């Protein structure tokens, strides 16, 4: 039962992020302010450690850590926040974490020659069908701004997939 409670809490956290961010972007915050709020606090907490220990961090740790930070950190966050200026939170929820497994399968094949399982191929095909349906709906509404936001969500999802593959 504890696993179900933990899963429910995780879903609530993931589901609240695009809604809260959309409210911030459409309210009084600029995307730059939201990115600063999201990552600035953690950066300030980490800064003293970094200043004291940066020479002890190996070159390989830097080469591995910096891309991870950009993939799952500021790069992905900035794309999501900027995309929420143009597209609804529901699109981010569908095109962000909803499409990430398809990107992991595709990029894993392209970059590492990992052949995806039949289930992964079926799942990626269903994800692509959903993306096309969402894009055609936005395109029929002749709303280029929504399509731009959707493209940012897909780019953020690619960064999330690269993060998973980097691990």
Kindly label every feature range from the protein language model:
Residues 24, 34, 38, 83, ...:
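Hydrophobic/aromatic residues within transmembrane alpha-helices
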Residues 6-13, 18-20, 41, 71-75, ...:
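Hydrophobic residues within membrane-embedded alpha-helical segments of Major Facilitator Superfamily
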Residues 1-37, 142-167:
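Glycine-/small-residue-enriched transmembrane alpha-helix faces in small-molecule transporters
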Residues 13-18, 26, 47-96, 105, ...:
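Specific transmembrane alpha-helical segments of multi-pass solute transporters/efflux pumps
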Residues 4-8, 60-70, 116-128, 150:
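Cytoplasmic-side transmembrane-helix entry/capping segments in multi-pass membrane proteins
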Residues 46, 116-138, 157-160:
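Hydrophobic transmembrane alpha-helices of multi-pass small-molecule transport proteins
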Residues 29-32, 90-91, 117:
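Residues that define the loop-to-transmembrane-helix transition and helix capping
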Residues 41-45, 95-110:
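Alpha-helical transmembrane segments of compact multi-pass small-molecule transporters, enriched
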């Amino acid at each position: 039962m504890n696993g179900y409670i933990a899963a429910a809490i995780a879903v609530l956290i993931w589901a609240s992020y695009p809604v809260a961010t959309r409210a911030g972007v459409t309210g009084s915050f600029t995307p730059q302010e939201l990115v600063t709020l999201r990552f600035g606090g953690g950066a300030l907490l980490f800064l003293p450690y970094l200043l004291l220990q940066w020479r002890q961090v190996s070159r390989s740790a830097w080469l591995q850590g910096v891309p991870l930070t950009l993939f799952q950190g500021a790069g992905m966050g900035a794309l999501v926040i900027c995309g929420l200026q143009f597209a609804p939170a529901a699109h981010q929820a569908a095109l962000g974490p909803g499409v990430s497994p398809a990107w992991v399968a595709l990029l894993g094949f392209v970059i590492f020659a990992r052949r995806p399982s039949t289930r992964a191929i079926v799942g990626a095909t269903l994800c692509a069908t959903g993306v096309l349906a969402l894009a055609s709906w936005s395109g029929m509404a002749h709303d280029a701004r929504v399509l731009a936001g959707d493209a940012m969500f897909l780019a953020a999802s690619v960064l999330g997939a690269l993060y998973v593959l980097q691990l």
